[in-house]
């Protein structure tokens, strides 16, 4: 193809990893701690499964973000019921409360998310509908496309239910 192949040298120590290529050196500090066991989380062990129109959900979340100032960390509150998903956000600018028709299996759930992360996940899926898998208000949710070739994990945020 005429493109030259570049060599990347990777080395690491107990605390750092180093990538060297061309005239560039990238050093990153390794982080210690407990991490989610993704393999266990990706099992079909969920409490709530939601099928929803991707475009409706994305448009609703986009509208909600108009009420949040840049840098303000207001979560979007999602209340999942039998046939409806209610999305709420409240800020100094105003408030929004919208409902979207869904197909739900499992339990009702009240959960909060950073709207930016939901938007990032939904924008890359081409399907008309998406499936959202949830365990509880403290556990990550998974958004999957129809072929399950794309899985997006989003951590929930704490919120004041009265907000």
Report residues per predicted region.
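DNA polymerase processivity clamps
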Residues: 1-31, 46-163
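Short hinge/gating elements
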Residues: 41-45
